[in-house]
């Protein structure tokens, strides 16, 4: 199955890095299953500690189902669980900014 790589950034509230990492170390099995079912794999999140910016990369199948994730109850519950430690928009979802690929080497 063909995949594409996606990169984006999110924003952590200063002082919340340890809690962010703790919550992700205990990621809910139903959330992992939901992401996999949506075609997501090889998902990593990195922290720019100086600027409190989270940088994420993932692979997704070309026929991914990520567009349906924001409406899913498990995703909504996870976002509510993370709302106190990340910057969110007025719609109750984390601020996510796509990042264009500027260079790639196999």
From Swiss-Prot:
Alphabetized UniProt keyword annotations: Carbohydrate metabolism, Cytoplasm, Isomerase, Rhamnose metabolism
Catalytic activity: alpha-L-rhamnose = beta-L-rhamnose
Source species, domain of life: Bacteria
Cell location: Cytoplasm
Associated pathway: Carbohydrate metabolism; L-rhamnose metabolism
Transferase in keyword set: no
Record: active site: 24
EC annotation from Swiss-Prot or TrEMBL: 5.1.3.32
Keyword flag Isomerase: yes
Gene Ontology CC, one term: cytoplasm
GO terms (BP aspect): rhamnose catabolic process
GO MF, one annotated term: L-rhamnose mutarotase activity
Residue sites binding substrate per the record: 20, 43, 78-79
Record's subunit section: Homodimer.
Family to which the UniProt record says this protein belongs: Belongs to the rhamnose mutarotase family.
Function statement: Involved in the anomeric conversion of L-rhamnose.
Protein name, entry field: L-rhamnose mutarotase
Lineage, top ranks: Bacteria, Pseudomonadati, Pseudomonadota, Betaproteobacteria, Burkholderiales
